[in-house]
From Swiss-Prot:
<comment type="subunit">
    <text>Interacts with MYC; leading to disrupt interaction with isoform p19ARF/ARF of CDKN2A. Interacts with TRADD; leading to disrupt interaction with isoform p19ARF/ARF of CDKN2A. Interacts with SMARCC1; leading to disrupt interaction with SMARCE1.</text>
</comment>
<feature type="modified residue" description="N6-acetyllysine">
    <location>
        <position position="1425"/>
    </location>
</feature>
<dbReference type="GO" id="GO:0043161">
    <property type="term" value="P:proteasome-mediated ubiquitin-dependent protein catabolic process"/>
</dbReference>
<feature type="compositionally biased region" description="Basic and acidic residues">
    <location>
        <begin position="48"/>
        <end position="70"/>
    </location>
</feature>
<dbReference type="GO" id="GO:0005654">
    <property type="term" value="C:nucleoplasm"/>
</dbReference>
<feature type="modified residue" description="Phosphoserine">
    <location>
        <position position="1030"/>
    </location>
</feature>
<keyword id="KW-0808">Transferase</keyword>
<feature type="domain" description="WWE">
    <location>
        <begin position="749"/>
        <end position="836"/>
    </location>
</feature>
<feature type="compositionally biased region" description="Low complexity">
    <location>
        <begin position="330"/>
        <end position="339"/>
    </location>
</feature>
<dbReference type="GO" id="GO:0045995">
    <property type="term" value="P:regulation of embryonic development"/>
</dbReference>
<keyword id="KW-0007">Acetylation</keyword>
<dbReference type="GO" id="GO:0006974">
    <property type="term" value="P:DNA damage response"/>
</dbReference>
<dbReference type="InterPro" id="IPR016024">
    <property type="entry name" value="ARM-type_fold"/>
</dbReference>
<dbReference type="InterPro" id="IPR035983">
    <property type="entry name" value="Hect_E3_ubiquitin_ligase"/>
</dbReference>
<feature type="compositionally biased region" description="Polar residues">
    <location>
        <begin position="1"/>
        <end position="10"/>
    </location>
</feature>
<feature type="modified residue" description="Phosphoserine">
    <location>
        <position position="310"/>
    </location>
</feature>
<dbReference type="GO" id="GO:0016607">
    <property type="term" value="C:nuclear speck"/>
</dbReference>
Length: 1992
């Protein structure tokens, strides 16, 4: 889990803190995020942040590096010798080389420039020369072309002190081509607001360094508290640097003589003279080649160049920038990435230029990459403004001294800012030249003639390189050193020299990635070492070097025959070397062409065999290898057959079904996609797979193990939408292709995409790398502006449009003799079993999927099956499926593709099985829909409200006629074979550069993409030549903007289902002139399809249903008439008795009435009224109608005939049938939209690179900001007016972030009238006390409220959502779009400035503000017993014994209209309301009878609607929806009003998404779907940033300390983490144990909280010995208080209950479990259902009393019967009453009085002790007993409990759950036995164990035999909590991992106990010799190992 800390105290640093100085938790703030780091960061800065970023990068000539190579780490490491940081100077040396593991090991985005992306390259020991704040590359060495292209942007000096170019740069007056779109707005001064709670704002590695430089106008400085100062320390020393550790071996091998002298290495830097100036403007350390003549010369040259800069506005400049590098805390990182798109383009540009400047990586360019890590200097700190007032004084004095010096030399003061970075660079020059001069010396050593000298030199060279990075090795002579090392590498007789030379080359590529272009020359020599192995070490080292080279130069290796050489002696190598060899093979296959196949051919058998290997990494590389081959050869059928010849298909098939799975989710997707490609392009392979029984494999993958091929009930195993998509694609491709003519002719139109540009030519423009891109609207605008601003001209070209005349059919469909079709004819049995096995599964996938892509694919596969199956088989297959009703609902869809598919399916079925379907199509409404289509004028027009894309199209398919359908749907082609999925890349790209696999190789190209507007996101691949943009998208800037957001790496986005044609969406190149035409094309094409639908529908009716004289000859057709007649009888005005209900029952349960018939008979509305209406005019009262209904459907007694004995539920079958029919209706009618960003990711080279759905969009949010103008509301003049100009706001920041920003700057203070009418221009000071208050407290009183227009914004809404929903522009845009078509809003959202008004909160409004996510007041609670209006009742109760009557929960549900909290509209609303009533009746029916058993008639699980559940799950899996808080209203409203539609886990996720802040929602999502975060690229990660607060507690005083912890942190939004005094453990395990132990302490008998009996623990530890605990088998419930209880005692108990409320709420909020067995009535109180508690609830707290009450109630009922009996005389009645007895005793003889049973001191009414119970007051007595036990006696405790709970979050959020489910939410899963199979699936053996290991099998056998108590002990031992989360071991996160505990050879494992790491659920298990020993040791460890966390 992304941020679970482990036992390593330094290991808890988190992503957001990439460049914090490794701060250890300080003052309870974990992860280096100090408590005082403001979580909103808004810094007014004089310039647009994006531009700052851009210019910074332009000047650098380079780009933020985002990969694992060392450059990042170097520059991100702390400044060890900054003079202004006393702490760093004193750091012991050992610490200088450490780095927190969580820092180093973050996977970063991969860049094409540096392709070092595997774990070994994560190593990095901070180098001293990072010590300067990094300045920009420049100076004399800046002569490279990349520098010349820069332009001094004097008119917009960045952040007032972005350092400018050197004189050399200025003299090259050539202006840059990049100008900021937003420069104008920037001049007004923009600020940046980010929100630390924004989950998407994880700071990527590059962003971290960005925060190193920040410009903050003096007034805007955020003062930091002492916590942040404390955090200014070097990186955490808690764990050694991975780079060091991984190379210690090498260094130790070099022998004593070459021992590296750390002190000497660093001494020149560490012992700098005191006068060293640390310039404030500097922000990036740099070592270049030595400058001309030191400082003086430099100053002189700068003075000369001042003239050129002086036009910059002087006023802004003096605001000096401080480097906040060491102090940056987590929250600032959220802004640090925020260089918006332009910044990105600038960066991309720079990286491109440096590449062009010197591809060979010569000396000059090498150092130009020195500071690759610079990313958004302003974005981070400028935006964040985390500069500290707490910096050491020396800094200021030195700056002052420097300024004085410069002014004395005649330098104008305002140039001081720009000068800063240069100075720092100069210092570096003098120092840094050391490295390159050292290299020159060593070079001479390498070239010496003496071997010992050469060995010494090469060893030292290794050390220089292993410790160096691009900064420290500036000017390294790569071109000279490489040939020298290659020469040494050829000294066959000297293994030492060869080994070290090989190492040196490896380290060089790691330290200086661009050197790889030179190292390429060594490839032949490396390969020689592999062809003849003389020294295994040298060979393995050569493999490591080749692996690094292969990432960028795989072609060179391939063509040198390297692939075969690497695999030649594969088995001889160590496992790591084998992995390297296979990785090289995979990289070599990346862009292989058919001509190069011979290089691979001989190695294929070896690779195929490798698929059977156990090593996961090897297998994944091998899969990648084959996937790339198949992708690259997809059109070469003969090559595909060769690739697949040797057992490949069999081995891969086995690999897919191995349990537990070896393949990760991404790799699985890639392998299945590989199969699809093979089948679609080479049908003979499809036939081969069919013969290998692929159907069973697919069935297993979709449904798990099964018995028999055609089951009635199909349960799908949970799979991600992407996996489903690929599996259904494969099924589709295994069937022959559909024909091209007849009813399928329309497919070509669908395929072409509705947006085909049929012009013969398209226009393209050329970017700076010489790549051509099609024009689109946004690009066009931006390019024009840039060209104008910079005076640049661009080349454009006209090129034939490949789509104008392509044959639209896909390749696989061109095959005339499809082998698959042949097989269907020749081997009908095989075809039959295939179809039988998979049809039902496909059908189920279609029904249960919500994303459009999967559904389109399924529909296509089903069509193929139906078309090719014969009639008999079809009849057999279809008999179990309601095909007709599905076709009916598909026909009502808003998605054209679905409608077309439904018509085609109906046509085929009518041709093949006319007799059957002519009846069913009538009954199920297919006819009705087809006629509707045939007659409809405005075909398929969708209502103006949000797209109601019915069951067919959900998600990103918008209503088809909205005109803005995304490329994702309307432009997507046919749903058939993916034959061209990848080929389109080849067929259309101009150069190999555009090939898919290439793009993946150049992973981070987007950053260098064409110049793109700042609101157009970075593209994720460079094939922009025909970027996936269809003219659909060119209709509006927004859509084309979305298209640019959806590059094809999002998979077949534009072709999600689109397969058989050249990608339609590639017609992006629509020139401005063609735009209008393209609009016509779209509507034209859509009109054509609509025309086809109408015509086809007409023909269909004509052909099959013209003779409407079907005179009821088929009895099935009479059902509708019967139902209509019965419905008319349900009339409320006349009493029709129960006959009509009986008729309805028989129709529902005996005939198979269809959903269509139920809808069209009016039955739903009528039954709803019948059950709910309560009007005067009703002939029969509602109660009687309800009892009649229950009598008919459930055999309860008729009204007036209730028996004396209890009424028990008898048969529920008819009611169950009715519920199922209603659910079917709901599924068919509902049209709830799903906002899914359903971009099946991936590309032929798949797997590890497939970007997860939505992650691109998240990256977009992370890099773009909204520009907002804050304005004081015109209605108020008593707060300050904002004068700071527009601010830039993180789109995912919450509205309350803006409030925090303004309030801490004093804008929340309401002025008195006599104060100044407006603000003086004084600098805004930040009120520290307010800032601290905001940071530390969860419950800050809101002071300001915000409006957009008239709309008041909720505090917990994201700013993006607010702008999107309420801004005026949004109103205009909404006409043409909706959420589904574009998650990111139109481009306008990102370019316009939005006005947000603020005004103070009025006192009266303050009390009832909305409160969510930490900023909440107490939610409104129901009036409790103590409120004044109940005072009179109290007296009645006490004096007269009158208690309130029990409320009937059924009343609330019995309403014929939608309750007020349902605001959505949907065709299925009546069905939903009826189901809601039926559920309430089933659940609460017993309230209608006074003697009924309290049992549900139908279990709630029977009401679950699978279709709604699928939609909800799909919605809740979408990270983008959760990040933006954009959950559709229907989902939240249904979740609360009709929770029964969804299973518990869906509602639990919905609860976490709506109840808490976004970060928790994201965390929950990641816990349940870990694959979301598997994406490799750091910036597409969606890691939440949850604050953590650590507290240390003492076990001896646990309860007391827990109370104070909850008092302090209960309402804080930070996650609470616990550590115990004198124990080393910290993190998840101790925290879980804390909740479990506190739960136990609260059950202590001496606290007097609970009813129950006292017991002692069976296995007490420590303070538990001798302590009594309360046990109640039914569940705990509060002990009642009487009226006379002591106030002090009451107060004490109330305090404990208040604490319990806080504890439980905090546990829910932090995803923790408590271990409290609470009773059901307790949970009813939590949900405010206490007024409906009855005598039945007594059974849940005290069964003994409950049974007595039960008998006495029978006596009361008999008494009532006697009294109602008219035949009784007074005497006989008296006599009869006296004979009423209980167990033979009369009531009087029982000796009861009016006190509470079991509590003689609690009187039920005044003087109750003295009032005996008689037969006459028995009823009053029973009522009082129940009321006191369940209500009156415990109300004060529960009021306190609810108060405590609501101080954390409102109880109203728990409405998603039923009382009986709260136990699961709070305490986890119910105890049940563990079976070995489940354990095997859920637990992970590792580090020495596999599933086949003896010890693992023993363990599973032992665990499955544990009883409940042993299970609890084991769980507490291993995880810290005695309960598992809901879902058992499956839901345990991280999963239980069993690792082997190793011993010395002399030790016997049987003598040792197992140990655990609770934070990661690791069980370290010795390999015991027998099962008995293991059981004994496990139980002993579990008993003895409780309650202590020490190092094992």
């Amino acid at each position: 889990m992304s941020n679970r800390p482990n036992n390593n105290p330094g290991g808890s640093l988190r992503r957001s803190q990439r460049n914090t100085a490794g701060a250890q938790p300080q003052d309870d703030s974990i992860g280096g995020r100090s408590c005082s780091s403001s979580s909103v960061v808004i810094v007014p800065q004089p310039e647009d942040p994006d531009r700052a970023n851009t210019s910074e990068k332009q000047k650098t000539g380079q780009v933020p590096k985002k990969d694992n190579s060392r450059g990042v780490k170097r520059s991100a490491s702390p400044d060890y010798n900054r003079t202004n940081s006393p702490s760093s100077a004193k750091k012991p040396k050992a610490l200088q080389h450490t780095e927190s593991p969580s820092e180093t090991s973050k996977p970063h985005s991969k860049s094409k420039k540096r392709h070092l992306d595997q774990e070994p390259q994560l190593k990095s020991a901070p180098s001293p020369s990072t010590s300067k704040a990094h300045t920009r590359k420049s100076g004399a060495a800046a002569g490279s072309r990349s520098q010349k292209r820069k332009r001094t942007e004097s008119s917009c000096i960045k952040s007032a002190s972005v350092s400018e170019a050197t004189g050399a740069e200025e003299r090259s007056a050539k202006p840059t081509k990049l100008a900021s779109k937003s420069a104008a707005s920037a001049k007004a001064g923009c600020s940046t607001i980010t929100d630390s709670s924004s989950a998407a704002s994880t700071s990527s590695s590059s962003s971290a360094v960005a925060s190193a430089s920040s410009a903050v106008p003096p007034g805007a400085r955020v003062k930091q508290g002492k916590d942040q100062n404390k955090a200014r320390r070097s990186r955490s020393a808690s764990s050694p640097s991975p780079r060091r550790s991984s190379r210690e071996k090498e260094q130790s091998k070099t022998g004593g003589s070459s021992k590296f002298d750390w002190a000497a290495r660093f001494s020149p830097k560490v012992s700098l003279p005191k006068t060293k100036l640390s310039l404030p403007g500097s922000s990036k350390s740099e070592t270049s080649k030595p400058g001309p003549s030191g400082l003086q010369a430099k100053l002189a040259s700068l003075r000369k160049s001042t003239k050129k800069r002086s036009e910059s506005p002087p006023a802004e400049l003096p605001s000096l920038r401080r480097s906040t590098r060491q102090k940056t805390t987590g929250s600032c990182a959220s802004a640090s990435r925020r260089g918006s798109g332009l910044g990105k383009r600038g960066a991309a540009e720079a990286r491109r230029q440096e590449k062009m400047a010197d591809p060979e990586g010569n000396q000059e360019t090498v150092n130009s990459s020195a500071a690759r890590t610079d990313e958004t200097p302003q974005g981070a700190a400028g935006a964040v403004g985390m500069t500290t007032s707490g910096e050491s004084e020396s800094d200021d004095s030195e700056m002052g001294r420097l300024q004085a010096l410069l002014e004395a030399r005649g330098l104008p003061p305002h140039l001081f800012g720009p000068l800063g970075p240069r100075m720092s660079q100069l210092f570096h020059r003098t120092i840094g030249s050391g490295a390159s001069s050292k290299a020159q010396q060593l070079l001479q050593g390498l070239q010496a003639s003496d071997e010992s000298q050469q060995l010494q030199a090469v060893i030292e060279m290794c050390q220089l390189l292993v410790m160096g990075n691009e900064e420290t090795l500036g000017g390294f002579p790569v071109k000279s050193v490489v040939p020298a090392l290659i020469t040494l590498l050829q000294m066959e007789h000297n293994f030492d020299i060869m080994n070290h030379a090989c190492r040196a080359l490896t380290y060089m590529m790691e330290a200086l990635p661009r050197s790889s272009a030179v190292v390429v020359d060594a490839i032949p020599v490396f390969l020689e070492k592999l062809q003849v192995i003389q020294c295994i070490d040298v060979a393995e080292q050569a493999l490591t070097a080749l692996e690094m080279l292969s990432r960028r130069h795989s072609k060179a290796i391939l063509q040198a025959g390297g692939l075969a050489d690497c695999l030649l002696y594969l088995e001889f190598f160590s496992i790591n070397a084998q992995r390297n060899a296979l990785a090289i093979a995979a990289n070599c296959c990346q862009s292989i062409t058919p001509d190069e196949f011979h290089f691979v051919a001989d190695s294929l058998p070896l690779l195929t065999q490798r698929l059977t290997h156990q090593d996961k990494k090897s297998v994944e590389s091998t899969c990648l290898c084959f996937a790339r081959l198949v992708d690259n050869f997809q059109h070469e059928e003969n090559l595909l057959q060769q690739v697949a010849s040797k057992d490949l298909l069999t081995n891969v098939q086995q690999l897919l079904v191995v349990t537990p799975p070896i393949l990760s989710s991404g790799m699985f997707i890639m392998v299945v996609r590989m199969f699809s490609l093979m089948c679609s392009n080479c049908p003979t392979l499809a036939v081969q797979l069919m013969k290998q029984n692929i159907a069973e494999t697919l069935h297993f993958l979709l449904c798990g193990a099964s018995n028999g091929s055609c089951q009635e009930q199909i349960d799908l195993v949970p799979r991600s939408p992407q996996e489903l998509y690929e599996l259904t694609s494969l099924i589709c491709e295994l069937m022959p292709c559909l024909p091209k003519e007849g009813i399928f002719a329309v497919d070509t139109m669908l395929k072409k995409g509705n947006a085909q540009n049929t012009d013969g030519a398209i226009w393209q423009w050329r970017d700076d790398r010489g790549l051509w891109h099609p024009y689109n609207r946004i690009d066009s605008r931006i390019i024009e502006q840039i060209n104008e601003d910079t005076g640049t001209a661009r080349a454009i070209q006209r090129k034939p449009n490949p789509l104008a005349n392509t044959n639209t059919s896909g390749y696989s469909e061109l095959k005339k003799d499809d082998a698959r079709a042949q097989l269907m004819k020749e081997d009908p049995e095989l075809a039959k079993s295939f179809i039988k096995t998979l049809f039902g599964v496909l059908y189920e996938v279609y029904s249960s999927s919500a994303g459009p892509a999967v559904r389109h694919k399924c529909l296509r596969a089903i069509l193929r099956i139906i078309y090719f199956a014969d009639a008999e088989l079809l009849k057999d297959v279809l008999k179990n499926h309601a095909v007709s009703s599905h076709i009916a609902s598909m026909l009502s869809s808003q998605d054209l593709k679905i409608v077309v598919g439904a018509l085609q399916m109906a046509e085929i079925l009518m041709q093949k099985l006319p007799d059957i379907f002519s009846v069913y199509f009538r009954r199920e409404g297919v006819m009705h829909q087809v006629k509707h289509l045939a007659e409809s004028e405005s075909l398929l027009t969708s209502p103006p409200k949000a797209c109601t894309n019915g069951s067919g199209s959900l998600g990103s398919t918008p209503s088809v006629n909205s005109g803005t359908a995304t490329a994702a749907t309307n432009a997507s082609a046919d749903l058939g074979s993916p034959s061209l999925q990848h080929s389109r890349d080849d067929s259309l790209d101009l150069s190999p550069q555009g090939r898919l696999s290439d793009v993946l190789k150049r992973k981070r190209l987007p950053k260098r993409g064409s110049r793109r507007p700042k609101y157009s996101p970075p593209r994720d691949d460079d094939k922009v030549d025909n970027q996936a943009k269809s003219p659909t998208t060119t209709q509006s800037p927004k859509s084309s903007f979305l298209a640019s957001l959806n590059p094809k790496t999002w998979g077949r986005l534009s072709a999600q289902s689109n397969s058989n044609n050249i990608e339609p969406a590639r017609t992006a190149g629509v020139s401005g002139l063609a735009r209008a035409a393209s609009k016509d094309t779209i509507s034209n094409n859509r009109e054509k399809i609509k025309g086809w639908i109408k015509e086809q529908a007409h023909k269909f009716v004509e052909r099959y249903f013209s003779s409407e004289n079907m005179d009821g000859s088929n009895p099935a057709l009479n059902v509708l008439q019967r139902l209509c007649a019965a419905t008319e009888q349900l009339n409320l005005q006349v009493d029709g008795g129960a006959e009509c209900l009986v008729e309805i029952r028989s129709i529902v349960s005996e005939s198979d009435v269809s959903s269509f018939e139920i809808q069209h008979s009016g039955f739903v509305k009528q039954l709803l009224l019948y059950l709910t209406s309560k009007s005067e005019k009703d002939a029969v009262s509602r109660e009687i109608r309800l009892k009649r209904f229950l009598h008919v459907f459930f055999s309860s007694p008729l009204p007036g005939e209730e028996p004396i004995e209890r009424v028990e539920p008898v048969g529920n079958a008819p009611l169950l049938a009715l519920v199922h029919k209603m659910n079917n209706c709901l599924s068919q009618m509902e049209q709830f939209p799903v906002k899914v960003h359903d971009f099946p990711s991936g590309n032929g080279t798949g797997g590890s690179f497939s970007l997860n759905r939505g992650s691109q969009a998240l990256k977009f949010f992370n890099t773009h900001q909204l520009k907002c103008q804050l304005q004081r509301h015109p209605d108020c003049a008593n707060v300050k007016q904002w004068k700071g100009g527009p601010v830039k706001i993180d789109p995912l920041a919450l509205v309350q972030a803006i409030e925090r920003y303004l309030v801490v700057r004093g804008y929340g203070r309401v002025r008195e009238d006599d104060e100044d009418s407006d603000d003086d221009g004084s600098d805004e000071e930040i009120d520290e006390s307010l800032a601290a208050q905001f940071l530390n407290s969860g419950n800050v009183r809101h002071r300001l409220q915000f409006y957009i227009g008239e709309h008041l914004l909720p505090y917990n809404m994201t700013v993006y959502q607010a702008v999107r929903q309420f801004s005026i522009q949004a109103e205009d845009e909404r006409e043409s779009t909706d959420d589904e078509s574009n998650p990111l809003g139109r481009a306008g959202i990102w370019t316009k400035t939005h006005t947000i008004w603020y005004k103070p909160v009025r006192e009266d409004e303050e009390s009832n503000k909305d409160c969510v996510g930490g900023k909440r007041g107490r939610a409104q609670t129901a009036p409790t017993k103590t409120s004044p209006r109940n005072a009179k009742k109290h007296d009645e109760l006490w004096n007269d014994g009158v208690c309130p009557s029990v409320s009937n929960p059924l009343e609330v549900y019995l309403i014929p209209t939608a309750p007020e909290n349902i605001t959505f509209e949907d065709p299925s609303l009546d069905v939903i309301l009826l189901l809601r009533v039926l559920h309430a009746v089933s659940r609460y029916w017993y309230y209608l009878y006074d003697n009924a058993m309290c049992k549900e008639i139908i279990p709630t699980s029977e009401f679950i609607n699978s279709k709604l559940t699928a939609k909800a799950n799909r919605q809740l899996q979408d990270p983008l929806v959760i990040m933006t808080g954009n959950i559709p209203t229907w989902l939240t409203e249904l979740g609360k009003t009709c929770p029964f539609f969804f299973p518990f886990d869906t509602r639990q996720m919905l609860f976490y998404v709506t109840a808490f802040d976004r970060d928790r929602a994201m965390q929950r999502l990641l816990d349940t779907n870990p694959e979301i975060n598997q994406s490799d690229s750091q910036d597409s990660r969606v890691a939440p940033r949850l604050d953590r607060k650590k507290r240390t507690v003492n076990r001896e005083e646990l309860l007391k300390q827990a109370e104070s912890v909850m008092q302090d942190l209960g309402s804080s939004r930070a996650m609470l983490e616990i550590q115990y005094e004198n124990e080393v453990g910290t993190g998840l395990g101790p925290t879980l144990e804390f909740y479990a132990l506190v739960s136990q302490e609260l059950q202590r008998a001496d606290l007097g909280l609970w009813r129950g009996e006292e017991v002692t623990l069976s296995n007490p530890k420590g303070s538990q010995e001798g302590t009594k605990y309360i046990q109640n088998l039914q569940g705990l419930f509060a002990l009642p208080f009487g009226r006379t209880a002591k106030p002090a005692h009451i107060a004490k108990v109330k305090m404990k209950f208040r604490f319990l409320g806080k504890l439980m709420a905090k546990a829910i909020m932090d995803f923790r479990l408590v271990d409290l067995p609470l009773g059901l009535p307790f949970y009813k109180w939590m949900l405010r259902q206490e007024t409906s508690l009855t005598s039945h609830d007594l059974f849940d707290i005290d069964p003994v009393v409950a049974r007595s009450v039960y008998h006495l109630e029978d006596i009361v009922r008999q008494k009532k019967r006697l009294e109602q009996d008219k035949s009784q005389t007074k005497e006989s009645l008296q006599y009869a009453l006296e004979t009423l007895t209980m167990n033979g005793c009369s009531v009087e003889d029982l000796g009861l009085d009016f006190t509470l049973p079991g509590f003689p001191n609690i009187e039920l009414k005044k003087g109750g002790k003295d009032i005996p119970v008689t037969i006459h007051n028995l009823e009053e007595y029973l009522r009082l007993v129940i009321f006191w036990a369940l209500n009156e006696g415990v109300s004060r405790q529960f009021d306190s409990f609810r108060d405590g709970f609501e101080s954390v979050f409102p109880l109203s959020h728990l409405q998603y759950f039923y009382p009986e489910e709260l136990d699961q939410l709070l305490c986890g899963s119910k105890a049940d036995t563990w079976d070995a199979k489940t354990l095997m699936e859920c637990c992970r053996p590792d580090h020495g164990y596999t599933h086949d290991s003896r010890a693992v099998k023993f363990l599973f056998e032992i665990l499955s035999s544990f009883d409940n108590e042993q299970q609890r002990l084991f769980l507490q031992f291993v995880t810290g909590s005695p309960r598992l989360p809901v879902g058992g071991f499956r839901s345990l996160n991280p999963p239980l991992t069993i690792v082997r505990k190793t011993f010395e050879s002399t030790e016997n494992p049987d003598d040792f106990l197992p140990s655990v790491m609770t934070c990661v659920n690791y069980l370290k298990l010795p390999d015991y010799s027998s099962l008995e020993i293991m059981r004994e040791k496990l139980l002993m460890a579990a008993r003895e190992g409780q309650q202590s966390f020490h190092l094992s």
